[in-house]
């Protein structure tokens, strides 16, 4: 049995295949996922698992150098936005690097998901609970 934090074989596999600047999406239950993009569906029911639970597990295993977030989260989900910024600040300290935070429109965000290696769908049912993680290197 794998000893690391990620037991889901699909998530573990996609993270292990990421190269520098490749992207991986963690999203809420409502984000449309392009047919051409690998879908890893973790959603069990509304809110389970939460966006932050999935993001926490993924970022424990993935080196992150930048993130892309929809601008709309600031107005429509400010509590999650603050939680997300706190998580990214802690992740920077843990990884020992600066994580660039880029904002874009939700429409542009949805278009960018098509370029990702995979989209991991959580059970989150709050607005704009989505992030594109850009892979960094550990050296």
Curated annotation (Swiss-Prot):
It comes from Escherichia coli O6:H1 (strain CFT073 / ATCC 700928 / UPEC). The active site is at 20 (proton donor). It is found in: Cytoplasm. Substrate binds at residues 28, 106, 128-130. This is D-ribose pyranase. One of its GO terms (biological process) is D-ribose catabolic process. Homodecamer. It holds the Pfam family RbsD_FucU. GO terms for cellular component: cytosol. It catalyses: beta-D-ribopyranose = beta-D-ribofuranose. GO terms for molecular function: D-ribose pyranase activity; intramolecular lyase activity; monosaccharide binding. It comes from the Bacteria. The keyword Nucleotide-binding does not apply. Its EC number is 5.4.99.62. Pathway: Carbohydrate metabolism; D-ribose degradation; D-ribose 5-phosphate from beta-D-ribopyranose: step 1/2. Belongs to the RbsD / FucU family. RbsD subfamily. HAMAP family: D_rib_pyranase. The gene is rbsD. Catalyzes the interconversion of beta-pyran and beta-furan forms of D-ribose. Keywords: Carbohydrate metabolism, Cytoplasm, Isomerase.
């Amino acid at each position: 049995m794998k000893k690391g934090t990620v037991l889901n074989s699909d998530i573990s596999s996609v993270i292990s295949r990421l190269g520098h600047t490749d992207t991986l999406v963690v999203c809420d239950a409502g984000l449309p996922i392009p047919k051409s993009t690998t879908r890893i569906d973790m959603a069990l029911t509304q809110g389970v698992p939460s966006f932050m639970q999935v993001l926490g597990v993924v970022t424990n295993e993935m080196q992150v150098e930048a993130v892309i977030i929809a601008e709309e989260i600031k107005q429509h989900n400010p509590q999650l936005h603050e939680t997300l910024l706190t998580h990214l600040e802690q992740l920077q300290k843990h990884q020992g690097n600066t994580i660039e935070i880029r904002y874009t429109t939700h429409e542009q965000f949805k278009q960018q998901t098509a370029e990702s290696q995979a989209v991991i769908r959580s059970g989150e049912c709050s607005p704009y609970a989505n992030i594109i993680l850009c892979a960094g290197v550990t050296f």
